[in-house]
Amino acid sequence: HIASIDNEDHTVIMIQVENEIGMLEDARDHSPQAEKAYSGVVPNAMLKAVKAKSGSTWGEVLTHDAYGDEQFMAYWYGRYVERLAAEAKTVLDIPMFVNAAMNSRGRRPGEYPSAGPLAHLKDIWHAAAPHIDLLAPDIYDTGFKQWAERYALPDNPLFIPESRCCPNSGARALYTMGEHEAVGFSPFAIAQSSAGEQREVRQAYSIIDELRPLLMTHRATGRVRGVLLDAEDRETVI
């Protein structure tokens, strides 16, 4: 549908595949089909992703706990998303990303939407879903800078598709662009936010647009930095 109606203006520049995919209440699926897969041979791509030196079945390669179960589930979630993305790109070849709900507040796999495209599972997701261009964090919890840093990686440009819309949203947009050369920053439900919150974001976007030539000139040179000071971070050393 998008390919047919947007083939001239190219309004759609990126597509999100699934939304905060993950497993809740348990770390992995225990259906008969999943148990059969768990007793099967681990694909080579997964062995490389977890740097396994021995073992052939999932039970031999992974730890027998919630974290091992999460890794198993992450690979197969990734394979499912890969099939969707690969097929979609045969019709419309534009960047595609998957977003993640964060594993915050000390929760264990199954207590948060586990096995999604989380930072500690990025190697598994990259191995399982090579047609996915970005793994993207939805940041609603405290520690904004720390969450952003986990996704701003050489093999994963930072894009924040969801973040709590708040008075700091404008500053966070400027920080992600300056410090991490982010692809984008998108506060959630901005249309329902207060006029003051919208004003901060609009002003930040306007500044970024004005700075775009300068930012592009110095992109990947290490000469552009971002500073974010708030109640959580009271100082930054550059």
Show the residue positions of the predicted features:
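Polysaccharide-binding and catalytic clefts of secreted carbohydrate-active enzymes
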Residues: H1-K122
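A general structural signal for stabilizing positions within well-ordered secondary structure
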Residues: D6, W125-H126, T176
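Short, flexible loop/turn elements at secondary-structure junctions
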Residues: Q16-I21, A100-M102, A136-D141, E162-C165
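Active-site clefts of carbohydrate-active enzymes
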Residues: E60-G68, P95-E111, W147-Y175, E179-V183, ...
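Extended hydrophobic/aromatic segments used for targeting, binding, or gating
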Residues: R107-G143, W147-A152
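Aromatic- and carboxylate-lined catalytic core of secreted/periplasmic carbohydrate-active enzymes
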Residues: L174-I238
